[in-house]
Amino acid sequence: MATTPMTVVDHEAEEAVAKAREDDKSRQVDAFDAGKPPPFRIGDVRAAVPEHCWHKSPWRSLWYVVRDVAAVVALGTAAAAMDSWAVWPVYWAVQGTMFWAFFVLGHDCGHGSFSDSRTLNSVVGHLLHSFILIPYHGWRISHRTHHQNHGHVDRDESWHPITEGRYRRLPPRAKKIRFTAPYPLLLFPLYLFYRGPDKPGTHFLPSSELFSPKEKGDVMLSTTCWCIMLASLLAMSCAFGPLQVLKMYGLPYLVFVMWLDLVTYLHHHGHHERLPWYRGEEWSYLRGGLTTVDRDYGWINKIHHDIGTHVIHHLFPQIPHYHLVEATKAAKPVLGRYYREPQKSGPLPLPLLGVFLRSIRVNHFVSDHGDVVYYQTDHHLNDTTKQK
């Protein structure tokens, strides 16, 4: 069939219309404001989650504990037997990741998603978290505050933004520590002892502002367990030498801390995601929860118990980790544009390191005023860092 001038014109017109539609669609995507109130309620999201996703199986939860404990014991036994400097770095990375898996299971105990038994949750939570030097109840309570106030500029507990006025008053060294790698990945132990800017207190003392008088006994119990673990490490250092304890425990612990800080940061920041933070009447539990971001960690997803499915976890922390993926899939049609599809990482989550590095270069502070605010960038800080 011959091509006529009219056919060419019609084809070009169709292409122009298609391009216009794509451009219009792109503008609509860019125009989406995640800070606007969503057209759905939290009850709508909950109704979309299958009923069985709320079921907690203590036996299934305990199976994950047994699996992870067996892995930690096997890794430690193998590394000690080989005692080779060619093996130690691999051991530190893998064992540190397993310590991180311990943390996630203990975290589930704190939420009550491990089982319906408070006693079982407390026993398992203390065993897992004390092993990695975390005061179980102290951290559980502060983490509860984080969930109850997620996305609130002033009341959130974990990686909350600094206001511009507070940021300007920070000494240069404090800014560098907070916004220059690798320092942000090493802050968790300091947070346990000192919390953060404008939030005094400690996770170890019942007199801390974090706790109510009725929580005093819980805090003291967890601090006692923490002290027992620390004393055990000191005793092993005397028996086997500090270098051996450093190789077997200290450096995996450091890897665990980096995992915890990295994952926590990534779930509440992004270098290209425009994530709102709220104050006053603009904040609600639903809107705050929707500021969180899901992340894909490749095959590590299953090792650290699908912690990357963070949006649904923040909205409904009672859902067990082994149901989070299914619950997320069920809720996505309701969440719509308010759900940010995570970028696929491949076998290892190496792209997320780039996301983290770019994010700490642009997410510095939020305005002192306004009930819906977004991160702003201190370009002078970046210029100073380059010069150094």
From Swiss-Prot:
A motif (Histidine box-2) lies at residues 143-147. This is Probable fatty acid desaturase DES1. Keywords: Fatty acid biosynthesis, Fatty acid metabolism, Lipid biosynthesis, Lipid metabolism, Membrane, Oxidoreductase, Transmembrane, Transmembrane helix. GO terms for molecular function: oxidoreductase activity, acting on paired donors, with oxidation of a pair of donors resulting in the reduction of molecular oxygen to two molecules of water. The keyword Cell membrane does not apply. It comes from Sorghum bicolor (Sorghum). Its main location: membrane. The gene is DES1. It comes from the Eukaryota. A motif (Histidine box-1) lies at residues 107-111. One of its GO terms (biological process) is unsaturated fatty acid biosynthetic process. A motif (Histidine box-3) lies at residues 310-314. Highly expressed in root hair cells. Barely detected in panicle, shoot apex, stems and leaves.
